[in-house]
């Protein structure tokens, strides 16, 4: 009788252990499934954050270039490569540091994709006068083609336009004064074209 009870207890114990083991396996499976889902969710969030950071980094990398470009356009309106040029009323001007003849000065300006200055307004005359005080500078004015017919380098004449000749000029003294320069007083004077003086180049504002 005691042996039968013992045998029944053993069977009950074994059955309970199996059921408990199955429950433990199911719990482990659920935990693994939840862990996998959580890992997938975290990976998705991480990838999204990485993508957002990459986008922000690209923006930050491009911003300095834009900022530098904006800064350069404010500091050097005539272009970062034209820092020796001066801006005035929508155009750029170069005041030379060396002296040469009128024709050489004209060629120098053309090499810099510009031309000898054309003074066609009182405002521009004042700008040049202030900038060239006590020195002589070539301007883009000559009567080499026809004596007394003064023309700017762009082909326009001075008969109906602004002029600022010094009193008594142009006088063609010596019969070969065919090029004009700004006198030390800021007024214009005719002189022979081989005379060496400074010069002013002019060009449009870069687009």
Curated annotation (Swiss-Prot):
Membrane topology according to the record: Single-pass type II membrane protein
Limits of the C-type lectin domain: 77-203
A Gene Ontology term for the protein's cellular component: external side of plasma membrane
TM region positions: 24-48
Localisation per UniProt entry: Membrane
Cytoplasmic-side segments: 1-23
Disulfide bonding pattern of the chain: 78-92, 109-201, 179-193
Post-translational modification: Some or all of the cysteines are involved in disulfide bonds.
Glycosylation sites: 67
Pfam family, one: Lectin_C
Topology feature Extracellular, residues: 49-207
Disulfide bond found in the keyword field: yes
Keyword vocabulary terms for this entry: Acetylation, Disulfide bond, Endocytosis, Glycoprotein, Lectin, Membrane, Receptor, Signal-anchor, Transmembrane, Transmembrane helix
N-acetylmethionine modifications at: 1
A single GO BP: immune response
GO MF annotations, alphabetized: carbohydrate binding; pattern recognition receptor activity
PANTHER family linked to this entry: MANNOSE, PHOSPHOLIPASE, LECTIN RECEPTOR RELATED
Protein role: Hepatic lectin is a membrane receptor protein that recognizes and binds exposed N-acetylglucosamine moieties of plasma glycoproteins, thus mediating their clearance (from the circulation) and endocytosis.
Name under which the protein is recorded: Hepatic lectin
Species: Gallus gallus
């Amino acid at each position: 009788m005691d042996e039968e009870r013992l045998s029944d207890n053993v069977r009950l114990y074994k059955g309970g252990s199996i059921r408990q083991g199955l429950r433990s396996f199911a719990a482990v499976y659920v935990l693994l499934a939840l862990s996998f889902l959580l890992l997938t969710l975290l990976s998705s969030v991480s990838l999204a954050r990485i993508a957002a950071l990459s986008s922000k980094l690209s923006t930050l990398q491009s911003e300095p270039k834009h900022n530098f470009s904006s800064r350069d356009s404010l500091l050097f309106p005539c272009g970062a490569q034209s820092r020796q040029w001066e801006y005035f009323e929508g155009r750029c001007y170069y005041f030379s540091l060396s002296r040469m003849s009128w024709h050489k000065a004209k060629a120098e300006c053309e090499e810099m994709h510009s031309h000898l200055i054309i003074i066609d307004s009182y405002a521009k005359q004042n700008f040049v006068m202030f900038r060239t005080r006590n020195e002589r500078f070539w301007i883009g004015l000559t009567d080499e083609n026809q004596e007394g017919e003064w023309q700017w380098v762009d082909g326009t004449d001075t008969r109906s336009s602004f002029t600022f000749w010094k009193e008594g000029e142009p006088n063609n003294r010596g019969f070969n004064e065919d090029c004009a320069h700004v006198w030390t007083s800021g007024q214009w004077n005719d002189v022979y074209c081989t005379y060496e003086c400074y010069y002013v180049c002019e060009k449009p504002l870069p687009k």
